[in-house]
């Protein structure tokens, strides 16, 4: 005989969350990486853009561990949200940076500075309003909803911080490395003209 009702059903669902969540998050990240590489036509740009989402997921897992909260039905939804928000922040920053490099004919440092001036404030405002909405969810009387709000707020905050710190640093280093490589390649001598 087996017990029926909501308790065994919830227990069974909770037991299946971790492998399902791990698999779906990994698949989402791989597909996002593929799309980003195609959009930017560059493996480095695609992977650097994805770092924002990766930092958000790491923050989610770390915060759950620190708070000793279980991965339940509500907190398992956070990864999907964080991947979406993180990739969005990353795309906006990378796209603007590439535009600044092409249109402004400036070096990586100036392009990062221009990108931060034009986009940094907008990203911060977008993140703060989103985080504020999830902080409000933390005042819910339902414990899983409170956890969901807290974990999501922390993860989105980390996405914002990453998009304004780590990501610009990686873009700068990548561009400087490309400049050094281009400078190391000797220009070919022009062929003599035969008249």
Which residues does each PLM region occupy?
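Membrane-embedded transmembrane helical bundles of large multi-pass transporters/channels
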Residues: 1-195
